[in-house]
């Protein structure tokens, strides 16, 4: 059976279009607010409302999938996201935009839960790594193309919203031509997110998603600031961020393939060790290109491998709940990491960004090594 079936390919095509829209809005919304002369703290609050929406959307999507299935949940999530986009055109104001970005955050989180859960339910122990690698490649490629679009088209609010909304609605079209079966509805008992978080045998995967959130959130949010403080121009900062993201895209498929072939545990250990090496190399400032490349290749691929580990520790009917727990863990890490790192950078030194990344990665590496004797490579439930 082929890994990349027709439903999988159509799902990833839809995700690519939706991610393009997400990337464009996430870049332009803060700029639109700044042009409207809103104070910085209000811009930050609007951004926080989006991530709060992510948390809320993550919590109830599993129940929605169980009730109405993958396809209808995907349509509903896309429509909620589109509503959050259209609402921005009404009036530029703090309270209104905070509300609309909260709604958009709910829709985006629902999309991620639906897509990730559908891929996990479609896969087996032999191909889940490659499926999640393809998912991350589509996500980062959409992010990259979204940034490219921002630099090429008009950034005016009323010029952007129509075609971004159209792109969101176009993201629904691929799934109109296929049906993703939800086998979870056949199970007698449903699982809760809290039960998945407490599952001892999946704890390494959950912890890996938290660490991944800390690492990626810190790199995405604070690497441009770090480079700015090194005296770089905006063009140079854009180049180095492109190197970082490109490394993450290029590393997805090889890491997924290696995880399927040699086991998640070995690949997780190597990834975390390489993140530590990349962080140390960034501190030396001797060779930024290779340091950023290996940091991106290892750091950006940690999440899908940790996900595959945790999901192979549960029964098939528990996959949606486990995926919710993992996305929630990643979101919490991506919120806490940048906040703590920014505080360290402001009060002490910019180098503490990489010291923090290396430190949390080292703690996770110790967990992976400590559990070597009692945590064998997981066997999937097919």
Swiss-Prot record:
State the InterPro entries in the record.
Answer: MFS, MFS_dom, MFS_trans_sf, MFS_YcaD, MFS_YcaD-like
Q: What are the protein's UniProt keywords?
A: Cell inner membrane, Cell membrane, Membrane, Transmembrane, Transmembrane helix, Transport
Does the keyword field hold Cell inner membrane?
Answer: yes
Q: Name one Pfam family in it.
A: MFS_1
Task: State its location(s).
Answer: Cell inner membrane
Q: Where's it mainly located?
A: membrane
- Superkingdom, natural source: Bacteria
Keyword Cell membrane annotated = yes
**Which terms does the record give in the GO molecular function aspect?**
transmembrane transporter activity
Q: Which PANTHER family match?
A: TRANSPORTER MFS SUPERFAMILY
Q: What is this protein called?
A: Uncharacterized MFS-type transporter YcaD
Species of provenance: Salmonella dublin (strain CT_02021853)
Q: In the UniProt record, what gene is named as encoding this protein?
A: ycaD
